[in-house]
A protein has these predicted regions:
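C-terminal peripheral helix-coil segments that are non-catalytic and often amphipathic
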Residues: 1, 95, 99, 132-140, ...
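Basic, helix-initiating cap at the start of DNA-binding domains
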Residues: 1-38, 55
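Amphipathic alpha-helical segments used for helix-helix packing
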Residues: 97-118
Length: 190
């Protein structure tokens, strides 16, 4: 097996173990010592793949960004009805959290406490991008004959709803799914 492929696989393995550790409802802080122990490698071996723990979290954030915005772009490209776009985007965000509970702790900033502040800034940017997409969809919805509301306020409400559901999921020890009551609450958001 080529060394580059092996190196890439080890990087992915490290990120997967971090994501698994983040799923622990106790929410213990992830240290490189604990991570190395779980992987049965030395801390030095971790640093051969990532220059810092912050870089490991950046790898998780990149995965989240690629996953979320890959699907959002597909939804916007494939669906003409703006309200259906919004519903699909919000459903995807809630579903992504259910399928990736460890990532929720990154998305709400829980796992980033006491880490490099640029990580939280990057998550804030991700939230801002999602909100901007929702705002644009709401503007398009107004041109399609749907009730015209303040797109900025409505987009902020929608994102706040999603982040609140993520927060509730994490704080419940991943017992209360983000999509719980979603279809009943959707009409209240639009």
């Amino acid at each position: 097996m080529p060394a580059e492929k092996k190196r890439g696989e080890r990087k992915m393995q490290i990120l997967q173990v971090i994501a698994e550790m983040l799923q622990d409802p106790k929410g213990e802080r992830i240290t490189t010592a604990l991570l190395a122990k779980k992987l049965d490698v030395s801390e030095a071996a971790l640093y051969r793949h990532f220059a810092s723990k912050a870089q490991m979290f950046e790898g998780l954030i990149e995965f989240i960004e690629q996953s979320v915005f890959g699907v959002i772009n597909k939804i916007v490209a494939d669906e003409d009805n703006a309200l259906k776009q919004i519903h699909a985007i919000l459903s995807m965000l809630l579903g992504f959290a259910e399928r990736n509970p460890g990532m929720v702790r990154v998305l709400i900033g829980d796992a980033l406490v006491n880490e490099n502040e640029r990580l939280q800034l990057r998550i804030n940017q991700l939230h801002d991008r999602v909100e901007a997409t929702l705002k644009q969809c709401l503007r398009v919805a107004a041109t399609q004959g749907h009730e015209e509301t303040d797109p900025a306020a409505r987009a902020n409400l929608m994102l706040s709803y999603v982040v609140g559901r993520w927060q509730q999921f994490a704080k419940s020890g991943f017992k209360r799914p983000p999509s719980e009551l979603w279809e009943k609450q959707w009409p209240m958001l639009v």
